[in-house]
Amino acid sequence: MSEPFSTILGTDGSGGRCKYLNKGIVGLGSYGEGYVAERVEDGSLCVAKVMDLSKMSRRDKRYAQSEIKYPTNCNHPNIIRYIEDHEENDRLLIVMEFADSGNLDEQIKPWGTGDARYFQEHEALFLFLQLCLALDYIHSHKMLHRDIKSANVLLTSTGLVKLGDFGFSHQYEDTVSGVVASTFCGTPYYLAPELWNNLRYNKKADVWSLGVLLYEIMGMKKPFSASNLKGLMSKVLAGTYAPLPDSFSSEFKRVVDGILVADPNDRPSVRENFQIPYINKGLKLFVQALKKNERILDSVKEVLVSQVSEILSSEVSPDAHRFLESQINYDVTHRGHVNKLGGGNGKSWKPRFLQIVRGQLILTDDEEGNNPKGLNLEQVQGACPVPYSTAKRDFVFALNTVGGEGMWFQAVSHGDMEMWVHAIQRGIGVA
């Protein structure tokens, strides 16, 4: 039996008998290899991915087929372009567009050795905007990506960013509830809270992954990390992360805080993100830079400019208003006894008295006001209930700050917890 794909992928000595020349390996996976390949016809470079189907489970075979099915339906400058595929002797060959500058993970990893620098704000913003445009296209075609991570963000010498690897992609139909999938998949560091809680999820899970990726681009590290999955789940569900570098504007950091919200109902869609004034302005700057870039084909520019123009001209959806700049409501007042989870290694719950008054959260040891600590509501990102499975206590709610810090409180009843969450949301102008 001859080697599979011998008439398609060969070596330099077989140029006249094959369509592509193997120019060297670029990656290894559990079930195969990826090669840089040169098309004999015109000398252009692409990537040839060869996978051994005989070693795969039924589920992994479905994921392999996804790498063909979904990119075939995608035609966008910020998504790796599918070229062709072949199957022979239990081997699958997929030929895809080649990105000549590696992937984003390779740009971030050197930071751990000290051999790297932070991205400048406009660089990080333009990376993020292109990924948003790719995800907007994917979601508009009723697809989920489900494996957004730095290793799947491919870079080119033209400045274009390409989202690749559709192995976990999923096609869906819109439903009344907006819930479309339940399969637990993707890379753990980027998984949304709803997946850790084994809940059904929708395109907001992709948005969470994009938020984790944006934090990684800005901070050169992941927002949530641990030595095991249980520890990672705990950190993701707690929703706390280290502040981003001061070199980035507060407006840009607020974008991260707005995305990394545990409740998907309070998390913006990609389209709603575009309505944030900072992002909206960034899109206009991106188009200006795009038009001046002589390394990008005019036909590619036209596609991106057309998409951005459509986004900028679209009306703000009713739901999007709650993701724009909020207005602190100084009239909201709420007081009551709570238990607060302390920090440090010996974490314990301690009785406290909490107040919302005149645009501030004030925490004291008792109702008499001893040992007061205040927090301006402008520094509060949101509040949400914490499931019993996570908190191991009833009636717990979390308060998240703009800087990424979190505080957990235990109310005296379920109704009291709901009143606290609603009062905080009213106070910060999102309810």
Curated annotation (Swiss-Prot):
Annotated Protein kinase domain residues? 20-279
- InterPro entries for the chain: Kinase-like_dom_sf (IPR011009), NEK_Ser/Thr_kinase_NIMA (IPR051131), PH-like_dom_sf (IPR011993), PH_domain (IPR001849), Prot_kinase_dom (IPR000719), Ser/Thr_kinase_AS (IPR008271)
- Active site feature: D147 (proton acceptor)
Enzyme Commission (EC) number:
2.7.11.1
GO MF, any single term? protein serine kinase activity
Residues annotated as binding ATP: V26, G27, L28, G29, S30, Y31, G32, E33, G34, K49
Q: Identify the keywords attached in UniProt to this record, alphabetized.
A: ATP-binding, Kinase, Nucleotide-binding, Serine/threonine-protein kinase, Transferase
- Give the main EC class: transferase
- Domain (PH) ranges: 331-429
Q: Which reaction does it catalyse?
A: L-seryl-[protein] + ATP = O-phospho-L-seryl-[protein] + ADP + H(+); L-threonyl-[protein] + ATP = O-phospho-L-threonyl-[protein] + ADP + H(+)
Q: Which family does it belong to?
A: Belongs to the protein kinase superfamily. Ser/Thr protein kinase family.
Q: Which PANTHER family match?
A: CAMK FAMILY PROTEIN KINASE (PTHR44899), SERINE_THREONINE-PROTEIN KINASE NEK1 (PTHR44899:SF3)
Protein name (record): Putative serine/threonine-protein kinase B
| Source organism per UniProt | Trypanosoma brucei brucei
Protein's gene: NRKB
